[in-house]
Amino acid sequence: MADARRAPLKDQTDVSGARVLIVEARFYDDIQDALLEGAVAELKAAGATHDVLTVPGALEIPAAVAIAIDSAEAAGKPYDAAIALGCVVRGETIHFEIVSMESARALMDLSVARKFPLGNGIITVNTDEQAWARAKPGDLNKGGDAARAALAMLRIKRRLAKA
């Protein structure tokens, strides 16, 4: 497995106080715990707050993000960014392809259409071993990567809004 490569982000626009939504699919509780741990650590380091919304599986994540964004906006407490966390392990049918591709496409569509910072931390793997290597904060830390991506996009949005 390749080592994780993370170039330091040069844009250090302040994101402290940002309100971030984490939507997690708890299909694999133990793997999800590791993904969530990595994401939360990154948000805390950036001074962001977060809410966690749990859904049954990865296919439900995009709709839950959209519903939560609208509800928070209507309540006058909008989210600044969102993070999608989940795990899809390949099985013997095409269900893996459907879940992984459709959840990714829906998240991308949502992010682009709404111009909304979103980090996709739905890991797609062939084995449990691959899932653990990607989920653990001490290894590839894909939960942390998703949080960093969401915060990076939020920095871009905030910086360009000031321009």
UniProtKB/Swiss-Prot annotation:
A Gene Ontology BP annotation from the UniProt entry: riboflavin biosynthetic process
Gene label: ribH1
EC number of the protein: 2.5.1.78
Record-linked InterPro entries: LS, LS/RS, LS/RS_sf
Claim: Calcium is one of the keywords in the record: no
Top-level EC class as recorded in UniProt: transferase
Disulfide bond in keyword set: no
Record-stated family: Belongs to the DMRL synthase family.
Function description: Catalyzes the formation of 6,7-dimethyl-8-ribityllumazine by condensation of 5-amino-6-(D-ribitylamino)uracil with 3,4-dihydroxy-2-butanone 4-phosphate. This is the penultimate step in the biosynthesis of riboflavin.
Catalytic residues, chain numbering: 95 (proton donor)
Record-listed (2S)-2-hydroxy-3-oxobutyl phosphate binding positions: 92-93, 134
Keywords: Riboflavin biosynthesis, Transferase
Organism from which the protein derives: Rhodopseudomonas palustris (strain ATCC BAA-98 / CGA009)
GO MF annotation, one: 6,7-dimethyl-8-ribityllumazine synthase activity
CDD domains to which the protein is assigned, alphabetical: Lumazine_synthase-I (cd09209)
Involved pathway(s): Cofactor biosynthesis; riboflavin biosynthesis; riboflavin from 2-hydroxy-3-oxobutyl phosphate and 5-amino-6-(D-ribitylamino)uracil: step 1/2
GO terms for cellular component: cytosol; riboflavin synthase complex
Catalytic activity: (2S)-2-hydroxy-3-oxobutyl phosphate + 5-amino-6-(D-ribitylamino)uracil = 6,7-dimethyl-8-(1-D-ribityl)lumazine + phosphate + 2 H2O + H(+)
Lineage of the organism: Bacteria, Pseudomonadati, Pseudomonadota, Alphaproteobacteria, Hyphomicrobiales
Gene3D superfamilies the record matches: Lumazine/riboflavin synthase
Pfam families attached to this UniProt entry: DMRL_synthase (PF00885)
Protein name per the record: 6,7-dimethyl-8-ribityllumazine synthase 1
Positions of 5-amino-6-(D-ribitylamino)uracil binding: 27, 58-60, 87-89, 120
Domain of life: Bacteria
